[in-house]
Amino acid sequence: MPLEEDVKQDVRKWSELYLEVPNKHLGGMPACPFAKKTWKDNKVLVGVKGKHKWYKTQLNLYLKNIDWNKHELLIFCDPYFNYGIEDLQNAIDEYNKEYNKKDVFFMGFHPDNPANEEEQEFLVTPNGDAPTVDSDVEYSMMLAQKFSLLQEASDTLHKSGYYKLWPRGYYQDVVVSRKKTYRRIFGGQHDG
């Protein structure tokens, strides 16, 4: 099987095993309550960087061509990564600086910085035990989605009490900082 297909299947399995299952640390709610439906409705586009291709050139091509009415999430994977965690974070920050005002939000995952039980147990052991994942593929991921859609979903989850079980520091780093950025760009007050 070609590497591109391996990566796409691995991303799908990651979502199924970690993001979509009822999570004991979150009162039975999945880590990402909207993931299962988004996949089911074919609203996820997984792109894989080609070998000997420039990262930003490839990602920019996906961003230029994505139809946000058809897809709600772009997961851009790089199985040829040769950059560190800080480099990926710098790229995420650059893309957010440029694209947040265009209603697109970026986040990422680097294989050298996986979620850990101490800080993000709910992302590591959704059912109490770490799922067994048979994969020899390593890749970085850059996720892009409509900022307004993400913030609307986050506000809905906040009102339901979903975030009460999140680790406080992780909640501040992810949810509160994102909401402050959204309110700064698009107006309104930070209320959560």
Task: Report each predicted region and the residues it spans.
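Expand to "…catalyze enediolate/carbanion chemistry for C-C bond making/breaking, isomerization
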Residues: 1-192
